[in-house]
């Protein structure tokens, strides 16, 4: 959780960039950026010090631009965080140098992973017509409850 959320300060989309940075850190390093025995201890660690990946601890297969990207996302101060000045900061980062943003935005990019379509473990009774039979009045009532 981003420090500004923990401190109950006003926040914006940069808290999501922080979250992506934490996830990317975990993917790269194979561990959490902050380790504590409980939520309070983890919160105190996040608020006490800035974590970063040192260039001398880059795992094999990862680049320095990936480290720079992750370190930019996990900045404690939102104004210093990568993406604080808009999504173009993310899109223009060197780690995405060869990424085709236009193909992504126009849905022309193939997924790098396609899960099997085997529905053997899927209970079909949960998807069959139960929502098709709902009348307009019931649907409106559901919408009002939301």
Question: Model features per residue range: what roles?
Answer:
Residues 48-59:
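Short proline-rich PxxP-based motifs
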Residues 84-146:
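C-terminal regulatory tails of eukaryotic serine/threonine kinases
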Residues 4-14:
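Conserved end of the kinase activation segment
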Residues 29-32:
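Structural helix C-cap motif within protein kinase domains
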Residues 72-86:
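A conserved short helix/loop substructure at the end of the activation segment
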Residues 61-73:
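Conserved C-terminal C-lobe helix
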């Amino acid at each position: 959780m981003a420090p500004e959320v923990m401190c109950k300060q006003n926040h914006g989309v940069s808290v999501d960039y922080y979250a992506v940075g934490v996830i990317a850190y975990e993917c790269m390093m194979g561990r959490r950026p902050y380790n504590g025995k409980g939520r309070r201890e983890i919160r105190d660690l996040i608020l006490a010090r800035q974590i970063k990946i040192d260039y001398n601890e880059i795992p094999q297969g990862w680049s320095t631009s990936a480290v720079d990207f992750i370190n930019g996302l996990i900045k404690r101060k939102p104004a210093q965080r990568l993406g604080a000045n808009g999504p173009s900061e993310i899109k223009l980062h060197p780690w995405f140098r060869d990424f085709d943003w236009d193909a992504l935005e126009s849905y022309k990019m193939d997924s790098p992973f396609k899960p099997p379509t085997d529905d053997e473990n899927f209970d079909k009774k949960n998807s069959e017509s139960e929502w098709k039979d709902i009348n307009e009045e019931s649907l409106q009532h559901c919408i009002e409850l939301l």
